[in-house]
A protein has these predicted regions:
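Nucleotide-activated sugar donor-binding and catalytic core shared by glycosyltransferases
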Residues: 1-169
């Protein structure tokens, strides 16, 4: 059994305060989930986050982690930014949604969404209705995503083998 219902992690820095927006929406919907949040090394607990913590008792917040695999494995579902963490969720077969912080992340988000591996919420700071729809679907267990073997965690080994082949010839 998973320890948390939802893990939220937005990388090293939440430049657009997306976490505050997500927590506000969770609060608006009066959603009862066991939450875990990884702030990232450069993200601080803002007054809005602290206020949410006082009202919501099923929440664990950590500043950072050295074991993302353990954190992702302990949850049923995730929300993350469109960077490296998307590959970690995919490798561990944990369904997730992507919120984009920067333009370059939209490509990854669209690709995961097209393959039905993740939900692409895009730039929620521009259209927060997407997070409302997503949270409703999550609470009603209406999110069905493919479990993919697309990412197996062995890419660096394959690359190093190819480099060694090139060096030997």
């Amino acid at each position: 059994k998973k320890k948390y219902d939802l893990l939220i992690t937005l990388g090293g820095f939440d430049a657009n305060n997306l976490l505050e927006l997500i927590l506000e929406k969770i609060s608006d919907h009066k959603i009862k989930l066991k939450l875990k949040i990884i702030l990232g090394h450069a993200t601080k607990k803002t007054s809005k986050i602290k206020k949410f913590m006082t009202k919501y008792n099923e929440i664990t917040i950590i500043d950072k982690t050295n074991n993302m695999k353990k954190e992702i494995s302990s949850t049923k579902f995730g929300i993350c930014a469109g960077g490296i963490t998307t590959y970690e969720f995919t490798t561990l077969h944990i369904p997730f949604a992507i919120v984009c912080q920067y333009k370059h992340q939209i490509f990854t988000a669209k690709e995961w969404h097209k393959r039905k591996i993740a939900k692409n919420l895009g730039f929620i700071q521009k259209d927060s209705k997407k997070i409302d729809i997503f949270l409703n679907q999550l609470m009603q267990n209406k999110i069905i995503l493919n479990k993919s073997n697309l990412v197996d965690g062995l890419g660096s080994q394959r690359v190093s083998k190819e480099i060694l082949k090139m060096i030997k010839t």
